[in-house]
């Protein structure tokens, strides 16, 4: 196209040509930068504590039938409600259930329904024991018993473990490695990435009766193990803020489900924008820890379903996977055979 500038002043002509040139340059600039691609794994887990939670870490001399009935609710009501929610959302077979041996044997029909849903079955003690209160032989006996129970239910050896109440010690870690477990999920060394479990820092507490020079020294670096660690911490779970346990010191019970949902969404949004290292978009994992005792309650269940649907709405860059799937993919990425 030829522009006739005859009759235009030289200054007007130059201005017109400048606008055309500027317009041409803008036309070559994309309207928006493409969104960074990432792969986000949603790891939904359920701890089927039920009555076992009151027998081990939750035991107290003041506990009574009223307290135990909350565990009965978890088994007889909460499990069914959660299974239906997970089925409606379309992720039932992508969930990992951590089931104490006591729950497997006390609620066999509910446990069978979990297995039939296609979910992964992992271990969580027998009576929700505090591993730090057990000697090595007790820990081994419990683990062996629970492995046998899980194998009888699924026909498959379990590969994952979560310490009840996250109470884990060096003996537990050594036992998991000796027994060939693929992963543990009891520790908080990261909140959005898998990593190799290590043998644990040998921490010596300060002894104020001695000279300061006796404790002013760094901790020895622990040995890296072959077991994968999948993040867990108190801010990823439902029970502590939303379930009142009268004789458990860290329970609250009267935090609204909307407050917890907001916290989880805030965490996801930050990771989506800034990635696990805070430098920008990147791949990350997003674990959630639910309980039929808590998320099975009527005033919480709707929020849980809404949260899961919200996560699904993020599209193909977000996928729900079992803990086993996430751990095996981590090993493949590290080029270490599982």
From Swiss-Prot:
What GO MF terms are annotated?
Answer: hydrolase activity, acting on carbon-nitrogen (but not peptide) bonds; metal ion binding
Per the UniProt entry, the signal peptide is none
EC? 3.5.-.-
Please list the residues that bind Zn(2+): 49, 124, 128
Q: What is the induction comment?
A: Expression is positively regulated by the cluster-specific transcription factor FGM4 and is induced during infection of coleoptiles of wheat seedlings. The fusaoctaxin A gene cluster is silenced by H3K27 trimethylation by the histone methyltransferase KMT6.
Pfam families on file: Polysacc_deac_1
Q: Which UniProt keywords apply?
A: Hydrolase, Metal-binding, Zinc
Listed CDD domains: CE4_HpPgdA_like
Listed InterPro entries: Glyco_hydro/deAcase_b/a-brl, NODB_dom, PgdA-like
Null mutant phenotype reads: Leads to reduced virulence and produces significantly smaller lesions and fewer spikelets with blight symptoms on susceptible wheat cultivars.
Biological process terms in GO annotation: carbohydrate metabolic process
SUPFAM superfamilies the record matches: Glycoside hydrolase/deacetylase
Q: Where is the NodB homology domain?
A: 65-257
* Function of the molecule: Peptidoglycan deacetylase-like protein; part of the Fg3_54/C64 gene cluster that mediates the biosynthesis of the octapeptide fusaoctaxin A, a virulence factor that is required for cell-to-cell invasiveness of plant host. The 2 nonribosomal peptide synthetases NRPS9 and NRPS5 form an assembly line which likely utilizes GABA as a starter unit (loaded on the unique module M1 of NRPS9) and sequentially incorporates seven extender units composed of the residues L-Ala, L-allo-Ile, L-Ser, L-Val, L-Ser, L-Leu and L-Leu, respectively.
The family annotation for this protein states: Belongs to the polysaccharide deacetylase family.
Protein name, please? Answer: Peptidoglycan deacetylase-like protein FGM2
Organism for this UniProt entry: Gibberella zeae (strain ATCC MYA-4620 / CBS 123657 / FGSC 9075 / NRRL 31084 / PH-1)
